[in-house]
Amino acid sequence: MNSSSSIKSLSAVAALLLGCLAIRAQIPDAEPVPKPVDSVTVADLILKGDACDRKFKANEALQSYLAAEKLEPKNARLLVSIARQYRHLMTDATTREKKVMLGNMAVGYSLRAAALAPNDSEAQLAIGITYAKMLLFQGTKEQVAASGPIKRSADAAIRLDPRNDTAWHILGRWHRNVAAVGGVKRVFGSLIYGSLPKSTNEAAVACFEKAIAINPQRPMHHIELGRTYAEMGKKDDARRLITKGLAMPDTDKDDPQTKQQGRETLTKLH
């Protein structure tokens, strides 16, 4: 092959390569194959729900949490969060029937969470928080029946995490409520359930003081301790603690209601 033929051959090859490159440049890059995103989606949904939860936007939080539940129905912490939203909606509900319905929804999710996570303090406490919130809307029989689950829930949560201030708070309220049980309710409960436990306001005080020591930033601890002192006739201590709690910024969904109860207690002290 002479030099002229070689040059022509090289030119042909070069032209062919350039043509292929031009065609390749006109073809858009293929879309990357998407990776499975279930776990990422769940995490994103929970983060979105948590953001709404911090703002006490229960309906918006539920939208994200319930969507996440469809992907991870056995996520105990997620079920705890869902139960909390139904309790928050209880606070905003305007009828007893709606409050009870929402409370029952919260109970269902709380029980599921506790069953799935026997070693998780928050999962165990969810039952006690929910039952305690429902007491105001229940009759004597239901209130008596709820006493045991509330106590066991708080005890389990504290055993798993001694620094769970909410658990100490719930236990304090339990002691105060049991100490206040009158003769008729106690007799009624004993006839149906054999016996009712006994407790004292002093035991309640110890629990609320523990909650304050762990987390002094929550007004409900101070107000409920003050209300307990009011039950004990310690008016100065009651005024001091309730007044302190009323001056603190809200940190929990039920703080406005708790503060109103504190104001009512203060009024009765004067």
Locate predicted features.
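N-terminal leader/linker segments that initiate helical-solenoid repeat arrays
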Residues: 23-66, 70, 76-90
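Terminal, low-structured helical/coil segments at or just beyond the last alpha-helical repeat
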Residues: 26-39, 184-192, 198, 215, ...
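Bacterial N-terminal signal peptides that target proteins for export
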Residues: 2-13
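Short coil/linker segments at helix-helix boundaries
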Residues: 48, 52-60, 84-119, 126-163, ...
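Bacterial N-terminal signal peptides
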Residues: 11-21
